[in-house]
Amino acid sequence: MERGLGTVAAVSDLGRRHHRNEDSFSVGNTALPDGTPAVVAVVCDGVSSSSRPHEASEAAALAAASFLLAALPRGMGGEQAMHEAVLVAAEAVNQLADAEREPGRNAPACTLVSAIAAGGQLTVGWIGDSRAYWVPLDRAGAARLTEDDSWAAQMVAAGLLTEAEAMADHRAHAITAWLGADAQDVEPHTATFQPDRPGVVVVCTDGLWNYAEGADQMARLVPDGSRSTPLPSAQRLVKHALDAGGHDNVTVALIPFPPPPSAQGRKGDA
């Protein structure tokens, strides 16, 4: 599954070890009230231990993107819009729960990561361990924009393990926050950045970042010319994950920053 709008692109692949793709994405263009282009990408990863994880990720991605594409033109600020979008996505996933149909099973659940590029700013929002990275055109100062909700991240934050030690543990990828009816109170993470140079935002599931965890590693993978060719570049990133083993579903969205003028006034999602 792939989608290219020129100003943003996303690709999702089954991987080599799974019989079903439980990832989903939604991307789109709109404009702020003053006509400034705004670009949105949402990527979700269904929790495999839950029931119907593919439905959860699809519902969350579509709900969050639809909210953002409607809220930004009305003048809602980026962080507020992102916060509300994650909550809207959470409610969409909650509505999938059906205890009578699936007794004893975990309710549908997924992670979510989203990015908005507009007005010289990048705003990201997330729940779970799907990630966003900033990769400048010159590759200098690449950065991870999100912090995982995971066992590994908790161990590192507590000073109990180094990142390398935590990631080597079999519990590393156990997530500590997600969207779903059996989740604790959902507290969306949001952050806003003001890059001082052009580049691209990489929004992805762990099916990609498992093979490029560090920001510098991710920066080396991003093809030259990604700002002008986001779809072929996203395809190459997915191919890298597949060539490296493809142990999971893999989904990546690329947003060129700043958004080109062609984003102005156009809308789209998938």
Name each region found by the language model.
Residues 1-270:
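PP2C/PPM-type serine/threonine phosphatase catalytic domain
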